[in-house]
Amino acid sequence: IRMDWKGWRQDANPTKDYEMFKLVREFLSEGQYLGFDANNGYSVSTAIQQGRKFEELGIDHFEEPLPNWDLPGLKQVADALDVAVSAGEQDAYRWWFHHLVLLGDPDILQPDILSAGGPSEVKKIFDLATMWNKPVMPHSPQAGINSMASLHTYSTVQNATRPHEFSTEFSGPLDDVHELYGDVVIPIKGQMHLSDRPGLGIELNETAVTKLTL
């Protein structure tokens, strides 16, 4: 579950957020993974209150409860809750992730391959996460090249224990993505099968590129 980030306002409607979470939790079968992404929308006290209520219903991770610059506040939230708190999707390079862990100490690190510095830099962040004993769960809101680069990098590390995000938020309709990149970018029964072809294993459909070019 992810809260809207376009009209950001702190603590906008925690009651509505909780009711939405409760409905989804009741809808999902027992044992199915469910996380909640606050999109930096809560204050410290509200994040702790919400997290405790989510814990009573069953939550697997609590993503970005606070603005990404509030590292001391993030530590307060992570220390107060049992649920794994995740952060890092807006952060760049291993040096910032060093500060994130030292000052905010989230349970899960979520680098985005586009904003964190690309595959080589993200691999270094993953290696640091292993040293810090932190699981990683990449942020990847674009099906296609973004997801494939992130998945290939993610597949190389031992602390890749959480589900990888699959989203078309910034990539357009999934049918268009499929037409552009082929079957390799589409999950099968919830799993991605990585190609062993050179690079990311993607071959652009030039006809589709022409068709979708504005």
Q: How would you describe each model-predicted region?
A:
Residues 192, 196-198:
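Helix-coil boundary/capping segments in enzymes
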Residues 52, 58, 69-191:
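Shared catalytic-loop signature of beta/alpha-barrel
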Residues 1-81:
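Metal-dependent enolase-superfamily TIM-barrel catalytic cores that perform enediolate-based chemistry
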Residues 10-13, 36-43, 63-66, 88-89, ...:
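Glycine- and other small-residue-rich loops at beta-strand/loop junctions that grip anionic moieties
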